[in-house]
């Protein structure tokens, strides 16, 4: 069986690696080709070393509570290369009226779970705190249809909870506008909490007590006895993950700087993949591990409905600005993992990670590495500036918010145009329609962050599922 994977990001690498595993497990030889338009693998993952600093241009970690990336690391034999967060500083700040306020202890993304930290918090007004408490009394929603995250938080917890916490935290994950973001597609557990417990605060409180009793310390048990922090990364940065996956693929199976221009089927039912240099490759199956809008472009002549559905998934652009400083140049104690910036603050940045505090080995002694996030669905206009302008803007914001009083030792700007899928209300229905259309094209599969999860672990799951489904499809065709 010949398999072509288009796209060398995490989803494509996971798909290719899983195909190699399944080939070995089932004794079915596979001729694997992975095509990537760029001159490197990894997609948005890119790690750089500079002057003793370890710079993550893209994702700096993955969630351990989603098991797929950890499970893959275990199969790869690199679990001992994983690094936990430094939990001495496990807290987040929120910018309010130009100052950094700690997120109250026990606040779980959308709602509080502890009474006293909320009461004493300087982040919320008293009317805002009382409005959040009304969640304990409000009835559950009767309409079971999809709802935006913004509408859900306003309804259950009030506008202040949305503007001060939910919106900036969600922006840090999805770079999205919460008034368009589908709750069912992004945070379905909160929908389930309302259905089963009525009150989100009560449901979170019960869950936190259960977790504290069974695990403790804010760590995740992966089922093998190991306990991980919520976020984990690699000793040498996330690109180590990419290198390990690439090294496990068959020699000569990866084609870099190879742009695919079209995917179609021939009269015999084989798949044809055309490249910009005029090559035509044939395969029994194809996995498109690209952005949805790229997949739509490649399939334009195959199926009129499928590209239309794929282009209905919007994307947002973003950028990261990494800045290195001497420790004495920053007045703030940096006693947390970073801060988020609510949109109501009207600032040109959406968040900042204290990279060298969050993980060890990211900066030389007596130095600090900070990473500022810009753009997203609510503030894409800021990205119109050049790299120098973005770096200067990020530095000015750190001067105001952290008391920085010296120029950075260096800056590194990384841009990600149309790279973050936006899970708007109705997203799951769109994905189901896409999957329905794929059923008309045996041997064609999609993978990546556009469909059922945007994180690294989600992309691993998506790629591995595509490979498994392709093997099942091929076996079914052989037996029919």
Protein language model regions, located:
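Conserved hydrophobic helix-helix packing surfaces used for dimerization/oligomerization
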Residues: 3-5, 32, 444
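Mid-domain catalytic core of redox enzymes
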Residues: 256-370, 375-384, 388, 396, ...
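Conserved Rossmann-like nucleotide-cofactor binding loop
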Residues: 11, 40, 293
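Beta1/beta-strand and adjacent pyrophosphate-binding region of the FAD-binding site
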Residues: 1-11
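Active-site/ligand-binding neighborhood in enzyme catalytic cores
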Residues: 88-91, 111, 115, 128-262
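Conserved flavin/dinucleotide-binding core of flavoenzymes
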Residues: 44, 104-106, 333-336, 350-480
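Dinucleotide-binding Rossmann-like beta1-alpha1 core, especially the glycine-rich loop
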Residues: 51-140
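Glycine-rich FAD pyrophosphate-binding loop
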Residues: 20-50
């Amino acid at each position: 069986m010949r398999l072509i994977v288009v796209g060398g990001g995490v989803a494509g690498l996971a798909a290719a690696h899983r195909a190699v595993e399944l080939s070995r497990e089932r004794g079915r030889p596979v001729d694997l080709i992975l095509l990537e338009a760029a001159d490197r693998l990894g997609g948005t993952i890119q790690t750089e070393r500079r002057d003793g600093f370890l710079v993550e241009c893209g994702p700096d970690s993955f969630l351990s509570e989603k098991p797929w990336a950890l499970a893959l690391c275990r199969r790869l034999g690199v679990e001992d290369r994983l690094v936990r967060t430094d939990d001495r500083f496990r807290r987040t700040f929120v910018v309010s009226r130009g100052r950094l306020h700690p997120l109250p202890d026990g606040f779980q993304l959308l709602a509080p779970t502890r009474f006293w930290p909320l009461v004493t918090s300087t982040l919320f007004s008293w009317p805002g705190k009382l409005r959040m408490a009304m969640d304990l009394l409000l009835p559950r929603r009767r309409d079971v249809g999809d709802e935006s995250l913004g509408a859900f938080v306003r309804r259950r917890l009030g506008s202040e909870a949305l503007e001060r916490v939910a919106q900036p935290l969600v922006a840090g994950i999805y770079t999205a506008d919460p008034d368009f973001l589908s709750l069912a597609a992004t945070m379905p557990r909160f929908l389930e909490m309302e259905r089963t417990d009525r009150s989100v605060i009560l449901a979170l409180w019960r869950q936190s007590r259960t977790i504290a009793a069974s695990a403790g310390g804010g760590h995740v048990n992966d089922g093998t006895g190991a306990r991980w922090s919520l976020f984990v990364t690699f000793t040498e940065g996330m690109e180590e993950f990419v290198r390990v996956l690439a090294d496990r693929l068959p020699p000569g199976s990866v084609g870099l700087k190879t742009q695919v221009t079209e995917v179609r089927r021939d009269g015999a039912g084989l798949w044809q993949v055309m490249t910009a240099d005029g090559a035509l490759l044939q395969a029994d199956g194809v996995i498109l591990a690209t952005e949805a809008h790229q997949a739509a472009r490649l399939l334009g002549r195959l199926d009129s409905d499928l590209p239309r559905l794929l282009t209905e998934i919007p994307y947002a652009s973003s950028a990261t600005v990494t800045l290195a400083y001497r420790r004495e140049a920053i007045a703030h104690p940096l006693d947390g993992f970073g801060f988020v910036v609510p949109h109501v603050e009207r600032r040109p940045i959406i968040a900042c990670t204290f990279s060298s505090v969050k993980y060890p080995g990211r900066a030389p002694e007596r130095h600090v590495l900070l990473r500022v996030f810009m753009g997203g669905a609510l503030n894409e206009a800021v990205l119109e500036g050049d790299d120098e302008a973005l770096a200067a803007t990020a530095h000015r914001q750190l001067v105001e918010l952290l008391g920085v009083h010296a120029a950075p030792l260096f800056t590194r700007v990384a841009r990600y145009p149309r790279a973050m899928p936006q899970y708007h209300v109705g997203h799951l229905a769109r994905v189901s329609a896409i999957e329905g259309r794929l059923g008309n094209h045996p041997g064609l599969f999609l993978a990546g962050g556009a469909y059922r999860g945007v994180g690294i672990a989600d992309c691993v799951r998506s790629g591995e599922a595509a490979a498994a489904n392709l093997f099942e499809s091929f076996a079914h065709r052989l037996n029919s």
